Amino acid sequence: MSDKKIKGLEWQEKPLSDNERLKTDSNFLRGTILDDLKDDLTGGFKGDNFQLIRFHGMYEQDDRDIRAERLEEKLEPLKFMLLRCRLPGGIIKPYQWIEIDKFAREHTRYQSIRLTNRQTFQYHGVPKGKLQPMHRLLHSIGLDSIATAADMNRNVLCTSNPIESELHQQAYEFAKKISEHLLPRSRGYLDVWVDGKKVESSDDLLKIEDEPILGKTYLPRKFKTAVAIPPLNDVDVYANDLNFIAIQDENGQLCGFNVLVGGGLSFEHGNTKTYPNVAYSLGFVPLEHTLAAAEGVVKTQRDFGNRSDRKNARVRYTVQNMTLDGFRAEVERCMNIKFEPTRPYEFTERGDRIGWVKGIDNNWHLTLFIESVRITDKPEKPLMTGVLELAKVHKGDFRITANQNLIVANVAEQDKAQIEAIARQYGLIQEISKLRENAMSCVSLPTCPLAMAEAERVLPDFISELDKVLSKHNVADESIITRITGCPNGCGRAMLAEIGLVGKAIGRYNLHIGGDRAGLRISRLYKENITLQEIVNEIDQLVARWATERQTNEAFGDFVIRSNIIAPVVNAHIDFWDATKIIPTTII
């Protein structure tokens, strides 16, 4: 970490968090993980290794549904790992999917592939003894899980735009370049998981390894990046630490990016020093300076981000402490160029185009709605087998979207009928409401250790209840972006929803409303600590008013603000916790 100290960074006078010691002592992220892999007495990892595996894309979890039962039997919790693959832009080849499916069926507790809103897949329930075989499998098919968790740049998102195929390809290539450029240089991942090579001392490593961008202690906290192609904001570009908005020239070619920083949706119940936030614009950079801008933002966060209090360590808090102008100046110093003024752009929607769409290259793309985003086989819905059968015949690629759906991309005209027939045979094509189409949740129980309430498992039935409400008020064809997250950590991006539920306790949630369709506005707390049925009753009353009092084409989130049902969040660091402090301009 740099020894630079500037006004507003009082944290530098405080003790560092223990995570900083952990990273320093880790032998460039190797730790003693190899020793733990040989320990058959526990299904988990000990000491620092419990956290270090996160830098390799894994979390230790247990099945909370049976935790109490196992404790009564004097057994440790049923421990296993979550694996999150690194998949910039969400693109995966059919041959890779076939191998991923095989491992999930044979070696994971839940025999499922979970799609995430970070455009990748997760394995849940991987036993410790299968971790090295899993990583070696990924490596053999050109994949890995490096830096998909912990204090590094995580999986880079990119708009899944199947229509503008040329522009999407250009933006996707930059998403891949950004991901590769910001990866750790350490061979720790390969040494532990692929080669199985033990390194004894960090002294020798210092001679052969360096982290010129991330630094020896990496970043202060998680760091998320997205690339968006207007007018579609499917990646929720305002919700990330670093964001690139694609700008086209007069010929429709990608000419550069607007760069935004300081988005993020996590907060802590009752902790007014934490808040969700939409990103701020630094300005525009031409294509040739894209990687320099990414590196400059990362280095600024590396040097000035809070390493004392991890709850205030994301980029938005660094921007608040340095001021936006101060943050911009440091990024410009790092990249040795100035930002140009922000170029005009507009976002109009966030949802996926479910069903078939034709690209400008005449290829077809089929977007499949995956409810609860867990691809598994059930008697009435053998979705996992269905996707596997698609992978066996598909000649294009798959794209996991930031809305947790799956695109069968680049289907030739002559192959379209076969792809559709398979998808219909296995229940992958279905008639659903607009409300369900735009609903999303995090994983939550039973595997997430942070979960305070259900999310993934209650979302389908909750949406069914809201569908009844919309039908009752004759707005069944309308869309309201609805999201549930099991805790305030933000994984379900509920704070950018028109209706957002944040878990508070088992069976109880905080209800937030007032986000907008384009993902530009944070929602505000409306009712606290209430049940799902109470939430349905509240939404019933609000939808009744919306159906009769709204203006032409007025979205639900816009209506509740215009009608003064709820005050907008204007400057989250000032007014998220107290609507009486709303002021019209951002002061940071």
From Swiss-Prot:
Binding-site residues, [4Fe-4S] cluster: C442, C448, C487, C491
GO cellular component terms, A-Z: sulfite reductase complex (NADPH)
Listed transmembrane segments: none
Cofactor note: Binds 1 siroheme per subunit. Binds 1 [4Fe-4S] cluster per subunit.
The entry's keywords: 4Fe-4S, Amino-acid biosynthesis, Cysteine biosynthesis, Heme, Iron, Iron-sulfur, Metal-binding, NADP, Oxidoreductase
UniProt-listed InterPro entries: CysI, NiRdtase/SiRdtase_haem-b_fer, Nit/Sulf_reduc_fer-like_dom_sf, NO2/SO3_Rdtase_4Fe4S_dom, NO2/SO3_Rdtase_4Fe4S_prot, NO2/SO3_Rdtase_4Fe4S_sf, NO2/SO3_Rdtase_FeS/sirohaem_BS
BP GO terms, sorted: cysteine biosynthetic process; hydrogen sulfide biosynthetic process; sulfate assimilation
EC number: 1.8.1.2
Matching Pfam families: NIR_SIR (PF01077), NIR_SIR_ferr (PF03460)
Class of this enzyme: oxidoreductase
Pathway(s) served: Sulfur metabolism; hydrogen sulfide biosynthesis; hydrogen sulfide from sulfite (NADPH route): step 1/1
Reaction(s) this enzyme catalyzes, per UniProt: hydrogen sulfide + 3 NADP(+) + 3 H2O = sulfite + 3 NADPH + 4 H(+)
Binding positions (siroheme): C491
Cofactor: siroheme; [4Fe-4S] cluster
Stated family: Belongs to the nitrite and sulfite reductase 4Fe-4S domain family.
The protein's role, per its UniProt record: Component of the sulfite reductase complex that catalyzes the 6-electron reduction of sulfite to sulfide. This is one of several activities required for the biosynthesis of L-cysteine from sulfate.
Name of the molecule in the record: Sulfite reductase [NADPH] hemoprotein beta-component
Species the sequence originates in: Actinobacillus pleuropneumoniae serotype 5b (strain L20)
Origin organism lineage: Bacteria, Pseudomonadati, Pseudomonadota, Gammaproteobacteria, Pasteurellales
